């Protein structure tokens, strides 16, 4: 948890001080830029009703932006923590329970067809969620709605 707070603090601190001599690897996404990404993502929908873009990949962690207009397949990451920062829209995070149709992909990554049981947490713009490694989770979106979020994936240690 401390590492997550340090990463989030670093990201927020970076937003305060943007200078020409910023260190290698520094990144700042202004709210106006994220709104532009939010507007573009729905134009590039995949068959699973989602669109995603990698904002930055630093090797051991990465930032992605995702748009969904339908329920996502459940997933689980054995060694990755997901931090979700909702940008727009609304949805529900379903986590825990039993993953039905669970199959391994690679490196401790699991996908399923649905989750039975578990907890449901309504999400909206401005919400931030920490999903621990090893927890089944899925994003649910009501018909006619969408959810867009920035996803920070960091290794669990």
What is each stretch, according to the model?
Residues 98-133:
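Short acidic-glycine-tyrosine-enriched beta hairpin
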Residues 122-127, 133-157:
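Ligand-binding loop in jelly-roll beta-barrel domains
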Residues 78-98, 105-114:
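Short, conserved beta-strand element in jelly-roll/cupin
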Residues 6-15, 19:
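Bacterial N-terminal signal peptides
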Residues 1-4:
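Positively charged n-region of N-terminal signal peptides that target proteins for export
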Residues 75, 82-85, 120-121, 128-129:
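His/acidic/aromatic-lined binding-pocket segments of jelly-roll/cupin-type domains
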Residues 18-78:
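A short, N-terminal "cap"/entry segment at the start of jelly-roll beta-barrel domains
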């Amino acid at each position: 948890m401390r590492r997550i707070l340090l990463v989030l603090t670093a990201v927020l601190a970076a937003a305060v001080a943007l200078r020409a001599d910023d260190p290698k690897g520094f990144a700042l996404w202004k709210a106006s830029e994220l709104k532009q990404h939010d507007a573009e993502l729905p134009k590039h929908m995949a068959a699973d009703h989602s669109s995603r873009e990698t904002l930055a990949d630093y090797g051991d962690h990465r930032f992605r932006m995702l748009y969904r207009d339908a329920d996502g397949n459940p997933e689980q990451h054995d060694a990755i923590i997901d931090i979700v920062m909702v940008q727009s829209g609304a949805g529900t995070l379903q986590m825990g329970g039993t993953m039905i149709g669970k199959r391994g992909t690679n490196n401790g990554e699991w996908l399923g067809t649905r989750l039975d049981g578990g907890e449901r947490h309504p999400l909206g713009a401005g919400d931030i969620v920490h999903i621990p490694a090893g927890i089944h989770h899925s994003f649910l979106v009501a018909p006619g709605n969408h959810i867009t979020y920035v996803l920070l994936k960091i290794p669990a240690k």
